[in-house]
Structure formats: structure tokens, C-alpha cells
Regions:
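Transmembrane helix-boundary elements of multi-pass transport/secretion proteins
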Residues: 1-53, 58-75, 94-95, 178-186, ...
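Hydrophobic alpha-helical transmembrane segments in multi-pass membrane proteins
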Residues: 26, 30-34, 68-84, 106-111, ...
Length: 215
């Protein structure tokens, strides 16, 4: 891979750099399927053993799985960092710690997504189907399967791409690599946090409705 320079002498994004971070986002999003299956299986195990989980114990179980997902995400980030720097010779630059923090926060969202889908679905097939569908949509809009330039040329996708957290992650990282001074990094950090909060709020509403029905 060759590092190119634009007319202003600022560094542009190479294909190796672009797909390093785009595919890392895809890898971390895959953590949602792992967490979703774990949450579903634990829920089913409690059902088989006729153990009715209290609201507190269910929340504790969800948080423990989310913590596991974050740990898995951190390990994935470390592995990708080692591989891309040593093998692909990708230079993460002076913003390495910011990039790592960004992907850890995205790991929080991915884990929360998997946990909420896992606790909400009644079959493991539904868990896998819903998460795979969400993953595909987020990734295709975010530029994991093609460059963002190609997405902007598709009439419908160039409107929907703003809904993908991966789009904001890729855009923020690319601007930082190019040395541009924007607030996109803050935006890309806040979006996964806000989405995680919304998912948690949704799960609380569902549980309260379930408790009112049981009563």
C-alpha cells in the first residue's frame, strides 16, 4: 500500500487504513451475536430449571454479559492492532488511543444490542436472524462492504447511511487520519452511547410491561 499526498500536502487515507478500521468495526459488531446467544441460553436454562429471575437478577445477568462483550471487544482491538501494524504496516498514528476508545465504546453498543435481543427473543433462530439483519444493515450503510464514496452514489443509501454508527466511526477516523479539525470524533463517541442508553431504556419498558401482565 502506498501513502499518497493531496495537493495541500496532507495525508490521505489508503485502502489498508480504510479497511483496517471498517473491518474492525465489523468484527466488534459481531460480538453482538456472541452476547445475544449467551443471554438467550442463560435465559432458557433458568426457564428449564424453573428459576424465575427477579428484575435485579436479570439486570445483573445482562450487565455481566455486556461486560464480557466489552472485554472481547478490547481483545479484538488488540489483535487487530498488532496484526495491522506488524503485517499490513498500517500506522495508527498519534490518535491511536482515541481510536481504541472509540471502538471500546462501540463494543459497549454491540454488547448491549446483543443482550437486549437475546433477552427479548423466544427462539435462538430469532436471535440470530434479527442480529444478522441488523449487522448487515449497519455494515452496508457504514461502508464495511464498499467505500463510503460508492454509498454516496446510491440515491437511497446516501440518505440512510447517517443512521449507521459505523458510518460516523469511519468518517471520524478518516478525518483524523487526514489531520482535519472537526467535531466528528465527539459525535462518533456519543452516538453508540446514546444508542446503548435507548436500548437499555427499551429493555426496562419491556420488563415493566411483562411484570404488569404477570400481576
Amino acid at each position: 500500500y502506498v501513502v499518497s499526498e493531496n495537493i495541500n500536502g496532507k495525508k490521505t487515507v489508503t485502502s489498508a487504513e480504510y479497511y483496517t478500521f471498517a473491518e474492525l468495526a465489523l468484527i466488534i459488531l459481531n460480538v453482538s451475536t456472541v452476547i445475544g446467544e449467551l443471554v438467550y441460553k442463560e435465559k432458557q436454562l433458568n426457564t428449564i430449571n424453573r428459576i424465575k429471575m427477579s428484575k435485579v437478577s436479570e439486570r445483573t445477568m445482562i450487565f455481566s454479559k455486556i461486560a464480557l462483550g466489552i472485554i472481547i471487544s478490547i481483545l479484538q482491538i488488540i489483535l487487530v492492532y498488532i496484526y495491522t501494524t506488524l503485517i499490513l504496516k498500517v500506522n495508527w498514528g498519534e490518535n491511536t488511543l482515541k481510536f481504541i476508545l472509540l471502538f471500546i465504546v462501540f463494543g459497549l453498543f454491540s454488547s448491549m444490542l446483543g443482550a437486549i435481543v437475546g433477552i427479548s427473543c423466544k427462539t435462538d433462530t430469532a436471535v440470530a436472524g434479527i442480529l444478522n439483519g441488523i449487522m448487515y444493515l449497519i455494515c452496508i450503510l457504514g461502508g464495511c462492504f464498499s467505500t463510503r464514496l460508492m454509498i454516496t452514489k446510491v440515491p437511497i443509501l446516501n440518505k440512510l447511511m447517517y443512521l449507521s454508527p459505523i458510518y460516523w466511526i469511519n468518517t471520524a477516523i478518516n478525518t483524523m487520519i487526514c489531520g482535519l479539525d472537526t467535531n466528528l470524533y465527539l459525535v462518533s463517541i456519543m452516538i453508540p452511547i446514546i444508542l446503548s442508553f435507548l436500548l437499555f431504556s427499551y429493555s426496562e419498558i419491556i420488563k415493566r410491561r411483562g411484570e404488569s401482565v404477570d400481576d
